[in-house]
């Protein structure tokens, strides 16, 4: 604004009349003659030429305005107390930048998958048959805790090294078994998953690969530790659970590796890694199957594209087909899909089995039919021949009964031929 405009606006302010407005139309008390008791005049100072879009500054004393009837307005209902919000959205495991609708479950989505509707922690505690305090004792991740909920021990691997197992203690194991029956066993699983699924076994996982020219076997590295707390929580939210309930359930089914630390004479167990599905918890196998649903669908689509068949038993991925020229393409794309889904292929355990050699899937020979391999059948016949000469006849007989039952499950005709070589009892 130039000096001329400024001077002109000041001169107009000196000679202009104040703008007044009567407020008699307001809800004010009237006297006996029907006239308002108080009349408030608002003075508007026009500070310059008004243009469209300009604002006027109105100066008035609010104490002179008539007071209307006060109506009671109830306060907004709190979703949760401050302490509860800090516990659920602490920075250790849960982000605080959440939308309000994330607190609520999608009941239509839960009904679509046949899952129980749990809106709050109270619903989860009631379903598990414990108090809210007991549930929170197991469902809060602590940076240090004096009592461990898992017992950790090492089991040697056949390939060398050790495998760490984390067995939950009695009360936590009981809670996880109830969760397995109420929730985890109902989670959606792909048709290609054959491990830890009721009605499926190593036989159903190996049968689709019988008589194929080439069999490709891949192995997922660190299968259980790759399924983290965030994956489990995200799966439950996608299935329809609210954020607090999903976070509570995810903590119940995961655990982090902990290191004992002594501080001022008190022994604490401090986490040294993220919370993951542990091998030893009743919920881990079925939960990992549900987390791998999208990977199974992508790998099954890849197999169909090249005329292959795909199945998975736990962390063992198997492809089979008759087009040998597409083998390398399938292997490369499968490894890429696995990496995109947050897993890793164990290169040392990748195997390609052709028709001229032994083809085994989940420990079952699939060259021409399901059953024992050429090397295993003579070994079992020798064990049947030596049955009567064993020092502990009953123990040896029970072991052979189990082997024959296993063969009968895979191939009844092969088991019947082997059983004919067995001597009757008492001879």
Swiss-Prot record:
<dbReference type="GO" id="GO:0046872">
    <property type="term" value="F:metal ion binding"/>
</dbReference>
<keyword id="KW-0479">Metal-binding</keyword>
<feature type="binding site">
    <location>
        <position position="315"/>
    </location>
    <ligand>
        <name>Mg(2+)</name>
    </ligand>
</feature>
<keyword id="KW-0814">Transposable element</keyword>
<dbReference type="InterPro" id="IPR000123">
    <property type="entry name" value="Reverse_transcriptase_msDNA"/>
</dbReference>
<keyword id="KW-0695">RNA-directed DNA polymerase</keyword>
<dbReference type="GO" id="GO:0003964">
    <property type="term" value="F:RNA-directed DNA polymerase activity"/>
</dbReference>
<feature type="binding site">
    <location>
        <position position="316"/>
    </location>
    <ligand>
        <name>Mg(2+)</name>
    </ligand>
</feature>
<feature type="binding site">
    <location>
        <position position="219"/>
    </location>
    <ligand>
        <name>Mg(2+)</name>
    </ligand>
</feature>
<dbReference type="Pfam" id="PF00078">
    <property type="entry name" value="RVT_1"/>
</dbReference>
<keyword id="KW-0460">Magnesium</keyword>
<protein>
    <recommendedName>
        <fullName>Retron Mx65 reverse transcriptase</fullName>
        <ecNumber>2.7.7.49</ecNumber>
    </recommendedName>
</protein>
<dbReference type="InterPro" id="IPR051083">
    <property type="entry name" value="GrpII_Intron_Splice-Mob/Def"/>
</dbReference>
<comment type="similarity">
    <text>Belongs to the bacterial reverse transcriptase family.</text>
</comment>
<keyword id="KW-0548">Nucleotidyltransferase</keyword>
<comment type="function">
    <text>Reverse transcriptase (RT) responsible for synthesis of msDNA-Mx65 (a branched molecule with RNA linked by a 2',5'-phosphodiester bond to ssDNA). The retron transcript serves as primer (from a conserved internal G residue) and template for the reaction, and codes for the RT. The retron is involved in antiviral defense.</text>
</comment>
<dbReference type="InterPro" id="IPR000477">
    <property type="entry name" value="RT_dom"/>
</dbReference>
<keyword id="KW-0051">Antiviral defense</keyword>
<feature type="domain" description="Reverse transcriptase">
    <location>
        <begin position="136"/>
        <end position="366"/>
    </location>
</feature>
<dbReference type="GO" id="GO:0051607">
    <property type="term" value="P:defense response to virus"/>
</dbReference>
<dbReference type="GO" id="GO:0003723">
    <property type="term" value="F:RNA binding"/>
</dbReference>
<keyword id="KW-0808">Transferase</keyword>
<dbReference type="InterPro" id="IPR043502">
    <property type="entry name" value="DNA/RNA_pol_sf"/>
</dbReference>
């Amino acid at each position: 604004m130039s000096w001329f405009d400024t001077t002109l606006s000041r001169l107009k302010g000196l000679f202009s009349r104040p703008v007044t407005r009567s407020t008699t139309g307001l809800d004010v008390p009237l006297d006996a003659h029907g006239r308002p008791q108080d009349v408030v005049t608002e003075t508007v100072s026009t500070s310059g030429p008004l243009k469209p879009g300009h604002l006027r500054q109105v100066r008035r004393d609010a104490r002179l305005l008539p007071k209307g009837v006060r109506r009671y307005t109830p306060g907004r209902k709190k979703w949760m107390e401050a302490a509860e919000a800090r516990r659920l959205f602490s920075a250790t495991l849960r982000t605080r930048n959440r939308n309000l609708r994330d607190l609520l479950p999608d009941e239509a989505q839960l009904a679509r998958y046949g899952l129980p509707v749990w809106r709050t922690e109270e619903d989860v505690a009631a379903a598990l048959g414990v108090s809210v305090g007991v549930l929170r004792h197991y469902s809060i991740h602590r940076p240090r805790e004096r009592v461990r909920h898992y017992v950790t021990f090492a089991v040697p691997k056949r390939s060398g090294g050790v495998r760490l197992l984390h067995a939950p203690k009695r009360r936590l194991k009981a809670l996880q078994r109830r969760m397995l029956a109420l929730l985890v066993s109902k989670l959606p699983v792909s048709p290609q998953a054959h491990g830890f699924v009721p009605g499926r076994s190593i036989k159903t996982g190996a049968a689709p690969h019988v008589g194929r020219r080439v069999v490709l076997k891949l192995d997922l590295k660190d299968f259980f530790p790759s399924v983290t707390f965030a994956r489990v929580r995200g799966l439950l939210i996608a299935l329809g659970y609210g954020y607090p309930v999903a976070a509570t359930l995810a903590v119940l089914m995961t655990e982090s590796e902990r290191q004992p630390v002594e501080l001022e004479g008190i022994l604490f167990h401090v986490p040294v890694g993220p919370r993951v599905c542990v091998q030893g918890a009743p919920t881990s196998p079925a939960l990992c199957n549900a987390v791998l649903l999208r990977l199974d669908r992508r790998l099954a689509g890849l197999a169909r594209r090249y005329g292959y068949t795909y199945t998975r038993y736990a962390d063992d991925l198997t492809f089979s087909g008759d087009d040998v020229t597409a083998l390398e393409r399938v292997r490369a794309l499968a490894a890429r899909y696995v990496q995109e889904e947050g897993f890793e292929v164990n290169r040392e355990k990748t195997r390609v089995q052709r028709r001229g050699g032994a083809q085994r899937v989940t420990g079952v020979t699939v060259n021409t039919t399901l059953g024992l391999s050429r090397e295993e059948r003579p070994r079992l016949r020798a064990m049947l021949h030596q049955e009567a000469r064993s020092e502990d006849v009953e123990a040896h007989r029970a072991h052979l009964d189990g082997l024959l039952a296993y063969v009968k499950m895979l191939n009844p005709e092969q088991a019947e031929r082997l059983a004919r070589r067995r001597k009757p009892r008492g001879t």
